[in-house]
A protein has these predicted regions:
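Glycine-rich, acidic and aromatic/proline-enriched surface loops and short helix-turn segments
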Residues: 126-134
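N-terminal Sec-pathway targeting helices
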Residues: 1-12
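Hydrophobic alpha-helical membrane-insertion segments, chiefly the h-region
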Residues: 13-22
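Structural recognition of the beta-strand scaffold that forms the well-ordered cores
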Residues: 40, 48, 107-109, 145, ...
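Electrostatic cytochrome c docking/interface patches
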Residues: 23-41, 54-56
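Second-shell loop/turn segments in exported
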Residues: 109-116, 149-154
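Flexible coil segments in periplasmic/lumen-exposed cytochrome c-class electron-transfer proteins
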Residues: 51-103, 133-189
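The canonical Cys-X-X-Cys-His
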Residues: 36, 43-53, 124, 164, ...
Length: 189
């Protein structure tokens, strides 16, 4: 009888430990997502470009979904350089045009077809570190203004970039096919 009680007691402790570890793991993931939200919204201010405006406010239905595919974008004219104009932006602040070409804020939501849904954490972190699309050095560089900002994001530690990734994977996917980056002649790279 004593032996059965001992075995039962050990089983209860073992199961309790497994549950506690599982809860701690969920809490740890929730903490990481919360940290990522803080970094995305308050520190890196990703929504400033990646969330289109609806008037003076952000269009939260398009939170981090990038430049709307059906929205017009600015077109840079090289004569503007003589007027010291080097960057044009759309009214939504999600498309940018300059001597480099035209770039569009990407869809950062986890949508599998139009966002980061097929990316891996490694691709995301490598992209921030290398300033190349999908973190692949054979891919094109990330264009301004994001290409300029990623040199700052590259200084973030791995824990912060992983937290940002965890948060981006946790938000609602939004289907929004962002236009490809255009070269100076208005053609996709």
């Amino acid at each position: 009888m004593r032996r059965k009680l001992l075995i039962f007691g050990l089983m209860v402790l073992f199961i309790g430990a497994i549950i506690a570890i599982g809860i701690r793991s969920v809490d740890s993931q929730n903490d990481m997502v919360a940290r990522g939200k803080y970094l995305v919204d308050a520190v890196a201010a990703c929504g400033y470009c990646h969330t289109p405006r609806a008037g003076a406010e952000y269009n939260m239905k398009m939170y981090l979904a990038g430049h709307p595919a059906d929205h017009p974008y600015p077109r840079y004219n090289f004569n503007m350089m003589q007027q010291n104009i080097f960057l044009l932006t759309s009214p939504l602040l999600s498309a940018f045009s300059g001597p480099f070409g035209t770039s569009f804020a990407s869809n950062l939501t986890p949508d599998k077809e139009t966002g980061l849904g097929e990316w891996t954490e490694k691709m995301f972190i490598d992209s921030m570190r290398t300033r190349h699309h999908q973190g692949n050095m054979d891919n094109r560089k990330i264009f301004p203004p994001m290409g300029t900002l990623t040199k700052h994001y590259a200084q973030m530690n791995d824990a912060d970039l992983k937290a940002i990734w965890a948060y981006l994977k946790s938000i609602k996917p939004v289907k929004n096919e962002v236009s490809p980056v255009l070269n100076r002649l208005g053609r996709p790279f």
